[in-house]
Amino acid sequence: MSTDHIRRPIRRALISVYDKTGLVDLAQGLTAAGVEIVSTGSTAKTIASKGIPVTRVEELTGFPEVLDGRVKTLHPRVHAGLLADLRNPEHEAALAELGVEAFELVVVNLYPFSQTVESGASVDECVEQIDIGGPSMVRAAAKNHPSVAVVTDPQGYDGVLAAVRSGGFTFAERKKLASLAFQHTAEYDIAVASWMQSTVAPEQPETDFPRWFGRNWRRQAMLRYGENPHQQAALYADPGAWPGLAQAEQLHGKEMSYNNFTDADAAWRAAFDHEQKCVAIIKHANPCGIAISEVSVADAHRKAHACDPLSAYGGVIACNTEVSPEMAEYVSTIFTEVIVAPAYAPAALDQLTKKKNIRVLVASEPQDGGAELRPISGGLLMQQRDQLDAAGDNPANWILATGSPADPATLTDLVFAWRSCRAVKSNAIVIVADGATIGVGMGQVNRVDAARLAVERGGERVNGAVAASDAFFPFPDGLETLTAAGVKAIVHPGGSVRDEEVTAAAAKAGITLYLTGSRHFVH
C-alpha cells in the first residue's frame, strides 16, 4: 500500500538563508501555526527583529559561531536532528538518549557564489562565497526525506505555509522537494568545480580539452514537438552562459518549434560571419541565400532572397544589424517562419507584427568562443567551434596557384564566398556575384555533384561569378563544372594528391585559382 499520501506534521523548523526574500512572512506563518524556529546568524537576527520567537543555533549546540561564520551548523546536535529516520525506532531512541529533537522542515538557500564570480570579485572573495554548511544541511534533509521536508527557493514559501495548515507535507511532496534540493546542490557544486578548474587551478593538459567538465542545463520551454510530430522536444539553457538564441526575446508570433530553433541558430551564426551588413536565409539548416551590402540591410535581404526565391519560401531570416522599415516591408510580402535580429526600427516592427504567423525574435550577438558539443551513442564529442579564425581565413595568407591576382572587387567576392562556406553543409560549393550567393550546392556526397547543383541554381548568373569550395577538389571535374559555366575565379583549400591536375585544369580554363590551406567542413 502506498504511503505517498501520508502527511508528517511540522513541529520544528531549521531556517538559514542568504536571500531573505519572504523570510519574515514565512517565520510569522510558522510561528502562528505553533512551529518552533531554530535559525542562524543574520537569518535569526532578521526574524528576531520582527518580534518573532527564534532559537539561535548556538543555544542549541552550546557552541558559538566561529571563524567569521564559517562554522555555524556543522554540529552533531544539528545534523542528528536532520538525519534521524523517524520510521526507525533505534534512531528515535538515539535522539532521546542524546537529548536531540528532530526537525521536520529545513529552509535553506546558499551563498551567492555564481553571482560573486560574475561580479569580477577576487579569488579570495569568491572562495568566501563557497557555502559549506548550507549544502550540508540541504543534502542531509534531502537524504532523510521520509522524515524531513527541505525547501531551497523562496518561491516555495507559500507552499510551506499551505502544507503546515494541512497537517504537513505528504511523502510524495517530500520526495519531490528532495529531488529539487539535490538538483540545487548539484548545480552549485558544478558552478564551484568549473570555476576552480578554469580559474583557481587551471589544468595544463596536452590539449585544450579538460579531463572533466560540467554544465547546468535548465528547461526553458516545452516545444510543440521535435523534428517530427511523433518526437517530443524541449529547450534547455545554461543560466551561466552568455545570452544567445536560447535567451532570445520573442516579440511576436506563435511559439517556436524545434526546427525553428535549429534553422534560426544556423541563420544567426551565418549572418554574424560577416562584418558588413548581412542577411542569411536558411531552410533545413542550409542557406537559401546569404548576402552582404555596404548600402543597406534591405539591399542585403533583396540579394539574399534572389539567390533561391523558391527555397526561401517558409525560411528563417537572420541579419546582423537593425531591421529597417524597407526590409520589413519586403519580408512581409514573403511567407517567413522566423526573423531574428539584434534590433528592429519601430516602423519595421509595426510592419512585421501585422503578419500573424511570423515569429519575430531579438537576440544578442552570438559569442562563439568555447566548445561545440554533439551527442553520440554512449558519449559526447567536443570540438572548438569554427570561428573562421584559421590562417587560411585571412586572404593575405592565400596562395595564388594560377592565373592573375584578383582585382579588389573580385577578391572581396572570393572572401565572402569562402566565409559563406562555413554555413553550408558539406560537400559545399558556393557561387557568388556582387556580395551575394547566387548558387549554393550543399550536402552532396561528392564534390562534383555539389558543383553541378550550384551551377544549376545559379543559371546564367554564374557567368563571370566567383566560387568557393569548403574542401579541396579531389579531381578536376568539380572545378571544370564551374569553369564551363563561366566562373572566373575559385578559392579552395588545396591539399589533394591531385592538386597539380586541378591547378592545370584551372590554368587551361584561364581562371584565377587560390589555395587557402584551411577547410570548413560542416556536418
UniProtKB/Swiss-Prot annotation:
Keywords: Hydrolase, Multifunctional enzyme, Purine biosynthesis, Transferase
Pathway listed: Purine metabolism; IMP biosynthesis via de novo pathway; 5-formamido-1-(5-phospho-D-ribosyl)imidazole-4-carboxamide from 5-amino-1-(5-phospho-D-ribosyl)imidazole-4-carboxamide (10-formyl THF route): step 1/1; Purine metabolism; IMP biosynthesis via de novo pathway; IMP from 5-formamido-1-(5-phospho-D-ribosyl)imidazole-4-carboxamide: step 1/1
Domain MGS-like: 4-152
Reaction(s) the record says it catalyses: (6R)-10-formyltetrahydrofolate + 5-amino-1-(5-phospho-beta-D-ribosyl)imidazole-4-carboxamide = 5-formamido-1-(5-phospho-D-ribosyl)imidazole-4-carboxamide + (6S)-5,6,7,8-tetrahydrofolate; IMP + H2O = 5-formamido-1-(5-phospho-D-ribosyl)imidazole-4-carboxamide
SMART domains (alphabetical): AICARFT_IMPCHas (SM00798), MGS (SM00851)
Cysteine pairings via disulfide bonds: none
InterPro entries linked to this entry: AICAR_Tfase_dup_dom_sf (IPR024051), Cytidine_deaminase-like (IPR016193), MGS-like_dom (IPR011607), MGS-like_dom_sf (IPR036914), PurH-like (IPR002695)
Pfam families named among the record's database cross-references: AICARFT_IMPCHas, MGS
Any GO CC annotation of this UniProt entry: cytosol
Gene3D superfamilies on file: 3.40.140.20, Methylglyoxal synthase-like domain
GO MF annotation list: IMP cyclohydrolase activity; phosphoribosylaminoimidazolecarboxamide formyltransferase activity
GO biological process: 'de novo' IMP biosynthetic process
Stretches that traverse the bilayer: none
Enzyme Commission code(s) on record: 2.1.2.3, 3.5.4.10
Keyword Ribonucleoprotein in record: no
Notes concerning its domains: The IMP cyclohydrolase activity resides in the N-terminal region.
Family: Belongs to the PurH family.
Protein name per its UniProtKB record: Bifunctional purine biosynthesis protein PurH
Organism: Mycobacterium ulcerans (strain Agy99)
